[in-house]
């Protein structure tokens, strides 16, 4: 190793010592720095973090930005965060700051937190899992070896967390990278099942509105999202959706035709008005990302055999929507990258808002089926909350989940939905109100929410 590299490593260690200060926690000695990853640098903490928090940040060798936060009285537990989305386009450092600010409760609860922006924009689950593990290695190498590492996946990031756990904490792995997995409002059905309803939205919207694409525009199969090189903007699509459905129009000013069409979309797909445009956006630009960059121009989704109900005239709707068959090669390729296998060898604890309109609560049943089929059903406990928000539930619920998961991972004390609910109530004294857990709730099958269909 060159003297310059040794000096850079020594400088990084000195910076960390200065960051923590004489009165800060005494951390284990860092391991020798790897050749590929530079040490994180002192970084300004986002507003709202607990007093005394120290932050570091950087950009990894793959190009992902990251932030790390260490509370004043760190007890050795690291929460490794996989964010939702995903974002399209190149990574932006601001994303890591936004995530840390949103999940400041983890730092307030005494845990170190680390989150990556992911190096590759778009629906690339396995690549994001590798980015997440790379950040863990940066933490271990340059900061400390945590006593316990919990992998936390939120929304789309839950699929990232599952993929990372399958790869780095599989059953029988002698030294798993993670001690437990926390999943919150997760997209848990993988890419080949979680997005079926968004194809349904595209075909139903086009049947009703006929403006995405318009008749005078180049026609394309709707599973494509958009053709390569298309110039449609989000503002353009929002204007088209408002023209047809009245999404941005006050209810009293909507025409009867707009209201009827919107009523069909909401009733058939079982989604609220407020989520229609977001799902339509995803089924446009994220579908484009998947088809153009992940499946070689082939469709991983289809709606052959799907029977839509809830409209004024179901027979006309089912006869009139466009129908597509999923391509077996695309399903296999996209599934390998994005579908969970369930082969996770450490405890998994999930929470899901039962009225989540972004990631349906019924996805929890799909996860349960997958994990049980892999022989790991005893490693999964699922909890549910009386919430409709997707991005964040409430402050006390996450420390409660963490405490229960740590007891399971460290002492073998497997939680139950009831024990998590009790713990949450106890946490309200410290973290404020917000416990709405439903210990007796069970999620229905995904097919009760999304029309079953033929699959390759």
Residue spans of the language-model regions?
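Alpha/beta-hydrolase-fold serine-hydrolase catalytic core, especially in secreted/extracellular enzymes
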Residues: 251-285, 289-295, 386-456
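Short beta-strand/loop motif that positions the catalytic acidic residue
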Residues: 344, 350-352
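C-terminal motif of bacterial Sec signal peptides marking the signal peptidase cleavage site
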Residues: 18-21
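Primarily recognizes the serine-hydrolase "nucleophile elbow" in alpha/beta-hydrolase
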Residues: 148-209
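Gly/Ser-rich "nucleophile elbow"/oxyanion-hole loop immediately N-terminal to the catalytic nucleophile
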Residues: 73-74, 135-155
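Short beta-strand element of the alpha/beta-hydrolase
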Residues: 76-85
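Bacterial signal peptide processing site
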Residues: 23-25
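Accessory cap/linker subdomain of secreted extracellular hydrolases
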Residues: 28-46, 187-338
């Amino acid at each position: 190793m060159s003297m310059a590299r040794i000096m850079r490593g020594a400088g990084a260690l000195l910076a960390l010592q200065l960051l923590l200060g004489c009165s800060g926690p005494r951390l284990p000695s860092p391991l020798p720095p790897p050749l590929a990853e530079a040490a994180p640098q002192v970084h300004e903490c986002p507003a709202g973090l607990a007093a005394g928090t120290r932050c570091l940040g950087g950009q990894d060798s793959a190009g992902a930005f990251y932030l790390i936060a260490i509370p004043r009285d760190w007890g050795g537990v690291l929460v490794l965060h996989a964010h939702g989305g995903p974002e399209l386009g190149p990574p932006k450092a601001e994303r890591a700051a936004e995530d840390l600010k949103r999940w400041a409760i983890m730092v307030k609860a005494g845990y170190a937190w680390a989150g990556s922006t992911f190096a590759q924009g778009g629906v690339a689950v396995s690549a994001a899992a590798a980015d997440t593990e790379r950040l863990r290695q940066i933490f271990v190498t340059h900061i400390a070896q945590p006593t316990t590492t919990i992998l936390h996946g939120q929304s789309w990031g839950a699929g990232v967390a599952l993929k990372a756990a399958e790869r780095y904490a599989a059953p029988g792995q002698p030294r798993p990278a993670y001690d437990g997995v926390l999943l919150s409002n997760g997209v848990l059905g993988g890419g080949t099942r979680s997005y079926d309803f968004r194809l349904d939205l595209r075909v139903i919207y086009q049947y009703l509105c006929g403006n995405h694409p318009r008749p005078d525009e180049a026609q394309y199969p709707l599973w494509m999202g958009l053709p390569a090189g298309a110039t449609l903007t989000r503002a353009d699509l929002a204007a088209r959706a408002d023209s047809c459905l009245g999404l941005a129009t006050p209810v009293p000013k909507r025409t009867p035709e707009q209201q009827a069409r919107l009523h069909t979309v909401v009733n058939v797909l079982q989604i609220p008005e407020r989520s229609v445009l977001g799902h339509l956006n995803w089924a446009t630009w994220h579908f484009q990302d998947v088809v153009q960059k992940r499946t070689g121009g082939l469709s991983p989704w289809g709606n052959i055999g799907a029977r839509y109900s809830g409209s004024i005239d179901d027979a006309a709707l089912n006869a009139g929507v466009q129908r597509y068959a999923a391509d077996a090669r695309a399903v296999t390729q996209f599934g390998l990258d994005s579908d969970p296998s369930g082969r996770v060898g450490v405890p998994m604890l999930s929470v899901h808002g039962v009225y989540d309109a972004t990631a349906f609560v019924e996805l929890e049943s799909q996860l349960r089926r997958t994990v049980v089929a892999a022989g790991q059903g005893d490693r999964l406990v699922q909890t549910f909350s009386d919430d409709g928000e997707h991005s964040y539930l409430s402050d006390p619920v996450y420390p409660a989940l963490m405490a229960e998961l740590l007891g399971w991972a460290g002492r073998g004390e497997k939680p139950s939905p009831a024990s998590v609910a009790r713990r949450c109530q106890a946490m309200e004294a410290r973290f404020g109100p917000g416990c709405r857990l439903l210990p007796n709730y069970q999620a229905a099958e995904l097919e009760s929410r999304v029309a079953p269909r033929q699959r390759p």
